[in-house]
Amino acid sequence: VSAIAIIAGATLGRRSGFMVGALAALASNFFFGQGLWSPWQMYAWGLIGYLGGVLADRGVFPDASASREHRINGKDGDSAPLASRVGRSERAKAVLLVAFGLLSGLLYGMVINAYGVLGFVRPLTVPGAIAYVAASLPFDVVHGVATAVFLLVLYRPWTLRIARVVRKFDVRCR
């Protein structure tokens, strides 16, 4: 969900990224169960999508349309992963995108851990909070790595397709 929220924020704007992240959490919890954690999940994934939009607006992430000429000339087909792009600045932007994917797993974990510490650590002490956060760290790292891998594979093809739909139907999201 984090990668999808980041891609939505980068292609459709920060507000759309927030909505995709928040509504993805709400919709998934209809299947997996709503609970007191649901608003925290909605906020965390919404925040990740929003930050994805902010960073894309600042030019930190690769612009999928920048490789259009490269794609038209027959190199690296339309669905080639982001890592196969040419250009030093685009590679640097791809590295920043992957780094944000890694950090987004930790950011999501921080928000959810705040809920967990406030809701479950009794008595609320600093050692108890540290133990709670330390226990969740492996899951947060796996979440970040998975988000980075999904961004590496899906960012370019999805942004190209979303940009095509936005152009075709004259969608105004920003």
Task: Briefly describe each language-model feature range.
Residues 70, 76-78:
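Intrinsic-disorder-associated, low-complexity terminal segments enriched in Asp/Asn/His/Tyr and depleted
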Residues 19-22, 154:
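Short hydrophobic alpha-helical segments that form membrane-spanning helices or hydrophobic packing faces
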